[in-house]
């Protein structure tokens, strides 16, 4: 038997109840995905003005599908500031909330 598809709701109808923001004590930064480099790596334009190469950890690889233009939270490496780990991906309603509150420019 085939699986029955359920109709998806329009993104604008979703209500945002809680949005995860970057935590300064963990050195987290907002970033926009510039390009996909392959092999679980992405090019990131961070909000602190640095272009970093991001790595998608194996625990989030299958659960978090990332495309160009997505807004994510990254943690820069302590050893190399030009590299970072992607730890969170925002949905469209969450991105709109971040823009309204002034987190994104």
Curated annotation (Swiss-Prot):
SMART domains tied to this protein: eIF1a (SM00652)
A GO biological-process term: translational initiation
Gene3D superfamilies recorded: Nucleic acid-binding proteins
Keyword annotations: Initiation factor, Protein biosynthesis
S1-like domain location: 17-91
Family annotation (NCBIfam families): eIF-1A (TIGR00523), PRK04012.1-3 (NF003084), PRK04012.1-5 (NF003085)
Entries under SUPFAM superfamilies matching the protein: Nucleic acid-binding proteins (SSF50249)
GO molecular function: RNA binding; translation initiation factor activity
Gene this protein is translated from: eIF1A2
Region spans: Disordered: 1-22
A cellular component term, taken from the record's GO annotations: cytoplasm
Signal peptide: none
Family membership noted in the UniProt record: Belongs to the eIF-1A family.
Purpose: Seems to be required for maximal rate of protein biosynthesis. Enhances ribosome dissociation into subunits and stabilizes the binding of the initiator Met-tRNA(I) to 40 S ribosomal subunits.
Identification of the protein by name: Translation initiation factor 1A 2
């Amino acid at each position: 038997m085939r699986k029955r598809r359920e109709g998806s709701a329009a993104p604008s109808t979703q209500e945002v109840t809680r949005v995860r923001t970057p935590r300064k004590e963990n050195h987290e930064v907002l970033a926009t995905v510039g390009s996909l480099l392959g092999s679980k790596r992405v090019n990131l334009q961070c909000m602190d003005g640095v272009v970093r190469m991001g790595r998608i950890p194996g625990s989030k690889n299958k659960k978090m599908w990332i495309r160009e233009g997505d807004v994510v939270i990254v943690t820069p490496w302590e050893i190399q500031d030009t590299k970072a780990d992607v730890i969170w991906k925002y949905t469209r309603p969450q991105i709109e909330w971040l823009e309204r509150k002034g987190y994104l420019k």
